């Protein structure tokens, strides 16, 4: 008889795990508290405009290929990928921007034109980054984080000094241009920590950027979610929407015995949570929780975000599909996220206009705009603050790109700390999970298997391997393999 597994949540890691577990012959049910699937990667449609509510960057295409290949499929069986050209654009001041080409040779030329001799240093840096990528993404990140010995290989031992240096030091060894430094330090922001707190080994993110390029699934990132749901359904996974898990039930021997869902008890013998780890533990009696409130409070979390989804009644100029605005003090903004949590004085921000390359995103002649300001998790969140910062960044956007856009806003929707808590039960309203610092890597992250409750597992951005969409796909695989290994 097939054994039942219930998965809480339907984000990337939960969907990934559901596919692997169904393939192994388990009877899998996914319980989603919201009315649509996808977790943070849901979709928002209004007046002919389409927005991804969450993740908007498609990096590490090989990880997606590897996921679908495990089921005899390809990404192209479910969605169409376009390589973006340019990959993205970075603004450093008024009418001062650099476009990151999809072609590595062009990137070398751009570096050399900005700083003589920098192309040679970039090549050396990317050689190291590629080697680290092959070690990390093709091997280490697929480890379950049970033992420190998982990190010990001949290749990692040879690079041990990189774990005790940091990205900021490595980037600045040979590159002096402030513009180029900002470009090279940008990719590790996806890992949720400051470059000065991110081990130098993580320079593999620069290879993911320059070496593998930036892609876009036609129709948006939600196409990936729909592809995974289609795959899961074909494997026999059941989905239940508006299914709010209120408690995880256990027997006297501390085995999972059931779930309280919308006030009703359902029997199950194994639970895998793709929901927020901290929130999941609050669904247990206090003596069955592995980590105290003090533990969580001491951890370094990735930022929260203030997001705006904006419909414009005209096409936007002087920007790209992905555009970063690094014209203000990065160190001050980082300090106001990690060290002295407060609303940023003069924030960096990110803008995304999918309709520049994908005509499914907006009606003809109009533009779908997505704006993001990284924030400290847990800070005050009011409508007044949201409105203030909307005008702050649109004023800057107009000045830097030399155009008027405010008058062209048809509608806007915001999403911030309160919404991350309400919609995703996110700890302190964080957006990306727990940061990948040296002391929050691999076996030092919250465990994928509960040490106090039998047959309770976790997957997602607070456990291994960490924040981001590709790591979420991998996390689902790791959790499913551990469940199988433990002979459930």
Describe the residue ranges of each PLM region:
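N-terminal glycine-rich phosphate/pyrophosphate-binding loop and immediately adjacent elements
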Residues: 2-131
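A conserved FAD-binding loop/helix module that cradles the flavin
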Residues: 55, 461-483
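Rossmann-like flavin
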Residues: 93-199
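Short beta-strand to alpha-helix junction loop
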Residues: 158-167, 210-230, 382-389
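A glycine-rich dinucleotide-binding beta-alpha-beta segment and adjacent secondary-structure elements
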Residues: 177-191, 348-350, 403-465
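Helical element adjacent to the flavin cofactor pocket in flavoenzyme catalytic cores
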Residues: 204-256
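Mid-domain catalytic core of redox enzymes
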Residues: 246-363
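FAD-dependent oxidoreductase catalytic-site/capping-region signature
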Residues: 348-435
């Amino acid at each position: 008889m097939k054994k039942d597994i219930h998965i809480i949540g339907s984000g990337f890691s939960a969907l990934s795990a559901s596919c692997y577990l169904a393939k192994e012959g388990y009877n899998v049910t996914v319980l989603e508290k919201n009315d649509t699937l996808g977790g943070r990667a849901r979709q928002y449609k209004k007046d002919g405009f389409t927005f991804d509510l969450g993740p908007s960057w498609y990096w590490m295409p090989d990880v997606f290929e590897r996921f679908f290949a495990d089921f005899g499929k390809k990404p192209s069986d479910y969605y169409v990928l376009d390589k973006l050209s340019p990959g993205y654009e970075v603004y450093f001041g008024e009418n001062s921007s650099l476009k990151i080409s999809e072609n590595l040779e062009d990137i070398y030329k751009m570096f050399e034109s900005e700083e003589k001799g920098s192309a040679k240093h970039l090549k050396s840096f990317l050689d190291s980054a590629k080697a680290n990528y092959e070690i990390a993404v093709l091997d280490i990140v697929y480890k379950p984080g049970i033992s420190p010995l998982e990190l010990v290989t001949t290749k990692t031992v040879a690079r041990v000094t990189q774990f005790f240096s940091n990205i900021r030091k490595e980037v600045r060894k040979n590159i002096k241009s402030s513009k180029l430094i900002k470009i090279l330090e940008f990719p590790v922001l996806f890992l949720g920590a400051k470059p000065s707190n991110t081990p130098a080994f993580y320079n593999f993110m620069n290879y993911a950027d320059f070496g593998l390029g930036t892609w876009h699934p036609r129709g948006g990132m939600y196409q990936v979610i729909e592809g995974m749901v289609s795959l899961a359904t074909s494997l026999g996974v059941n989905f239940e929407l508006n299914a709010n898990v209120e408690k995880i039930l256990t027997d006297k021997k501390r085995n999972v015995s059931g779930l309280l869902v919308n006030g009703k008890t359902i029997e199950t013998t194994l639970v895998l949570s793709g929901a927020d780890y901290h929130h999941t533990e609050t669904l247990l009696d206090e003596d069955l929780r592995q980590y105290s409130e003090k533990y969580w409070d001491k951890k370094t979390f990735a930022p929260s975000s203030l997001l705006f989804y904006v419909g414009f009644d005209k096409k936007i100029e002087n920007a790209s599909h992905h555009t970063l605005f690094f014209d203000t003090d990065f160190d001050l903004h980082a300090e106001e996220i990690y060290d002295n949590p407060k609303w940023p004085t003069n924030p960096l921000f990110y803008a995304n206009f999918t309709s520049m390359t994908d005509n499914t995103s907006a009606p003809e002649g109009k533009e779908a705009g997505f704006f993001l300001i990284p924030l400290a998790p847990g800070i005050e969140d009011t409508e007044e603050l949201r409105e203030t910062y909307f005008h702050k960044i649109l004023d800057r956007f107009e000045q830097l790109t030399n155009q008027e856009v405010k008058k062209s806003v048809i509608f806007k929707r915001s999403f911030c700390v309160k919404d991350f808590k309400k919609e995703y039960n996110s700890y302190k309203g964080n957006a990306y999970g727990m940061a990948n610092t040296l002391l929050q890597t691999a076996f030092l992250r919250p465990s994928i298997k509960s040490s106090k409750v039998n047959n309770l597992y976790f997957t997602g951005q607070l456990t291994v391997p960490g924040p981001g969409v590709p790591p979420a796909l991998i996390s689902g695989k790791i959790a499913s393999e551990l469940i199988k290994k433990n002979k459930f």
